[in-house]
Swiss-Prot record:
Species: Saccharolobus islandicus (strain L.S.2.15 / Lassen #1)
Homology family: Belongs to the GcvP family. N-terminal subunit subfamily.
Function: The glycine cleavage system catalyzes the degradation of glycine. The P protein binds the alpha-amino group of glycine through its pyridoxal phosphate cofactor; CO(2) is released and the remaining methylamine moiety is then transferred to the lipoamide cofactor of the H protein.
GO biological process, one term: nucleoside metabolic process
Protein name (Swiss-Prot/TrEMBL): Probable glycine dehydrogenase (decarboxylating) subunit 1
Keywords: Oxidoreductase
EC identifiers of the protein: 1.4.4.2
Reaction catalysed by this enzyme: N(6)-[(R)-lipoyl]-L-lysyl-[glycine-cleavage complex H protein] + glycine + H(+) = N(6)-[(R)-S(8)-aminomethyldihydrolipoyl]-L-lysyl-[glycine-cleavage complex H protein] + CO2
GO MF annotation, one: glycine dehydrogenase (decarboxylating) activity
Subunit structure: The glycine cleavage system is composed of four proteins: P, T, L and H. In this organism, the P 'protein' is a heterodimer of two subunits.
Length: 455
């Protein structure tokens, strides 16, 4: 009989096997072919259980291998470094919030429910949208859910997505719609401006099966889409839903999606008080305009205000018949354990920042990213491939292969941008990149290029 090397549960295993009428673990797993089973002890925990001291020592030895950068990373691609006020970490670390419990029971969850309602209210004001849910996993999953939602509403099968939208988000969408019969048609972008190609949009939208049209603002290259309202008009004309993906911080400078009547808005709250987390967990934003055909098809949880039997105001989850814990396979979405804790972090961050703080932060990011782009393009033969205005992220074209530049930056303990092509990279600059950090990046790249050209 199988015996676990150290967990003292052998009697319990025997009881469980007896209860289900099985004589051994081997019999329980006899459907698994013998040739793929491992019939030896695994070298887990160095072959023995480790003490707390030994575990801590092992982890610390691995941590020492980390490289401490001379400046904040200049890589973004949708997940960017920002300063997080200590109050954000403090509040979400409180035991009332720091839980995986879903507030199904409003009578014991008023604090958590009210905090989530505040998040929804703040995000709705920021986006100028009517209804915001309590969170999604991330931008990619929110976009995928928006595509599925559009298909449920109008039954159409084609979704237009820009080539200059985040490729990682598009990959998530393609994964989620597998087996649904939904087709993703990519719309080209203008190679000079970096913005959506309106002629190609008109061409691709000239069919009757358009379910939704998606546009990202700013787009993957950090460029503001100056014709976004025209895209919304095209969607209306085709009786398709418009989906806008937006960087929340950019709304300190530009018009919110609700002002130009977007149907669905998605995004990520990572830039509103969340760390990089090696790419996750993140915090998906999902909002719709006031239309019950949209609201009833929304994924995720929604917190609302009601009154109890004594007439007192209270908070509770609403429209729960949309959700999988009630309707199972007929639910609008299978998203269940969402990012409630991170939504509260967003609420704290937005409350702390306020309207003026949001505008000032957006301006700071705008000017710092433009300063970095200007200094980089002052290097001989370094240029920007796109001429349109940008925010936070921007593409730079180099005269030598970017891999060589990236390797040199790593030698100097600097993290460069994301490689877009052999000679082009996407850089990210936020409020944490001061003049010293930017100048260090520029001087290191200039030294590298000059050294190659003179050798």
């Amino acid at each position: 009989m199988y015996k676990h090397p150290w967990l003292p549960n052998l009697d319990l295993i025997d009881e469980m096997l007896k209860e289900i009428g099985v004589n051994s673990l081997d019999e329980l797993f006899n459907d698994i072919p013998a040739e793929i089973k491992i019939n030896r002890l695994l070298n887990v925990a160095k072959g023995k259980p480790l003490s707390e001291y030994e575990i801590e020592k092992e982890i610390n030895e691995k941590v020492k291998k980390n490289v401490e950068l001379q400046a904040p990373p200049f890589i973004g691609a949708g997940i960017c470094p920002h300063y997080i006020p200590n109050v954000v970490k403090f509040i979400i670390g409180r035991s009332e919030f720091y839980t995986s419990y879903t507030p199904y029971q409003p009578e014991i969850s008023q604090g958590l429910l009210q905090a989530l309602f505040e998040y929804q209210s703040l995000m709705a004001e920021l986006l100028d949208m009517d209804v915001v849910n309590a969170s999604m996993y991330d931008w990619g999953s929110a976009l995928a859910e928006a595509v599925l939602m559009a298909n449920r509403i109008n039954g159409k099968k084609t979704v237009l997505v820009p080539e200059n939208a985040n490729p990682f988000h598009k990959e998530v969408v393609r994964t989620w719609i597998g087996g649904k019969g939904i087709k993703i048609e990519e719309v080209k972008y203008d190679k000079n401006s970096g913005e959506l190609d309106l002629e190609d949009l008109e061409k691709k939208s000239n069919i009757d099966d358009i379910s939704a049209i998606y546009i990202q603002q700013p787009n993957f290259f950090g460029i503001f889409e100056s014709n976004i309202e025209h895209v919304i008009d095209v969607a209306k004309h085709k009786r398709a839903l418009s989906i806008v993906g937006v960087n929340p911080l950019s709304l300190g400078l530009i018009k919110p999606p609700g002002s130009y009547e977007a149907d669905i808005v998605v995004g990520d709250g990572q830039e509103l008080g969340l760390p990089l987390n090696f790419g996750g967990p993140l915090m998906g934003v999902f909002a719709v305009r006031w239309d019950m055909s949209l609201v009833r098809q929304m994924p995720g949880r929604i917190v609302g205000i009601t009154k109890d039997t004594n007439g007192k105001m209270g908070f509770t989850l609403i429209l729960q018949t949309r959700e999988q814990f009630i309707k199972r396979e007929k639910a609008t979405s299978n998203i269940t354990t969402n990012e409630a804790l991170l939504a509260i972090a967003n609420a704290v961050y937005l409350s702390l920042l306020g309207k003026e703080g949001m505008r000032e932060l957006a301006e700071e990011i705008y000017f710092r990213s433009h300063y970095a782009a200007k200094k980089l393009t002052e290097i001989d033969n370094v240029s920007m491939p796109f001429r349109s205005d940008f925010f936070e992220e921007f593409a730079i074209r180099f005269p030598i292969e970017y891999d060589k530049i990236s390797n040199k930056l790593k030698e100097r303990k600097l993290q460069g941008g994301l490689k877009l092509s052999d000679y082009t990279s996407l850089f990210c600059v936020t409020e944490v990149h001061d003049k010293k950090s930017i100048d260090l990046l520029v001087s290191t790249i200039q030294e590298m290029i000059n050294g190659v050209e003179t050798s």
